């Protein structure tokens, strides 16, 4: 369902087709089951709209309210919910079987930063030429990365070979 169709989900005033409705007042108080004509008269008297809140109920539930204000509140709620969502990104760090300690520490520091920021990390180990014959060296390096990141992340996908590279996914630890 599109956002526009979802917004027009609630029928108002003349769009309501039921003969009898359960009416709720402006402050949320129950008025009771009344005819549609009575409810429309009450809405006009109070200078508000009659909005169908629950069309599937028997009888349908309608509320006296300012529809413009209602739409604004709904869009505000949607906007806040969207802001609270955090988009998890996957950051990638590439290693080689011959990565020295200095480079290893820099890459490890970046991995720790990614995981503490809440992002997932993809650790890629690239083999070139004859290095493919020594996959055990690469596996040992990935095991070392896993051990060094044990306190900030958990391995989501264990090392597996994809063509000429080994890939391992690490997710941040839940707080």
From Swiss-Prot:
GO molecular function terms noted in the UniProt entry: ribosome binding; translation initiation factor activity
Subcellular location: Cytoplasm
Keyword Cytoplasm carried by entry: yes
Main localisation: cytoplasm
GO biological process: ribosome disassembly
Keyword flag Lyase: no
One protein family per Pfam: IF3_N
Disulphide connectivity of cysteines: none
Example of a GO cellular component annotation carried by this entry: cytosol
Classification via InterPro entries: T_IF-3_C_sf, T_IF-3_N_sf, Translation_initiation_fac3_CS, Translation_initiation_fac_3, Translation_initiation_fac_3_C, Translation_initiation_fac_3_N
Record keywords: Cytoplasm, Initiation factor, Protein biosynthesis
PANTHER family, alphabetized: TRANSLATION INITIATION FACTOR IF-3 (PTHR10938), TRANSLATION INITIATION FACTOR IF-3, MITOCHONDRIAL (PTHR10938:SF0)
Subunit structure: Monomer.
Protein family per UniProt: Belongs to the IF-3 family.
Role played: IF-3 binds to the 30S ribosomal subunit and shifts the equilibrium between 70S ribosomes and their 50S and 30S subunits in favor of the free subunits, thus enhancing the availability of 30S subunits on which protein synthesis initiation begins.
Name of the protein in question: Translation initiation factor IF-3
Organism: Chromobacterium violaceum (strain ATCC 12472 / DSM 30191 / JCM 1249 / CCUG 213 / NBRC 12614 / NCIMB 9131 / NCTC 9757 / MK)
Name of the gene encoding the protein in the UniProt record: infC
């Amino acid at each position: 369902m599109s956002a526009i169709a979802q917004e027009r989900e609630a029928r108002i005033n003349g769009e309501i087709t039921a003969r009898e409705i359960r009416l709720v007042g402006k402050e949320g108080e129950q008025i009771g089951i009344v005819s549609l004509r009575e409810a429309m008269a009450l809405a006009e008297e109070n200078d508000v709209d009659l909005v169908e809140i629950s069309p599937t109920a028997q009888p349908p539930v309608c509320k006296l309210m300012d529809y413009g204000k209602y739409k604004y509140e709904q869009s505000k709620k949607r906007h806040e919910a969207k802001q609270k969502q955090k988009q998890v990104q996957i950051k990638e760090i590439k290693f080689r079987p011959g990565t020295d300690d200095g480079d290893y520490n820099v890459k490890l520091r970046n991995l720790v930063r990614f995981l503490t920021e809440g992002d997932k990390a993809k650790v890629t180990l690239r083999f070139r030429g004859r290095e493919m014959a020594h996959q055990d060296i690469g596996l040992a390096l990935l095991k070392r990365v896993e051990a060094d990141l044990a306190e900030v992340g958990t391995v989501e996908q264990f090392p597996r070979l994809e063509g000429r590279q080994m890939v391992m996914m690490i997710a941040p630890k839940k707080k």
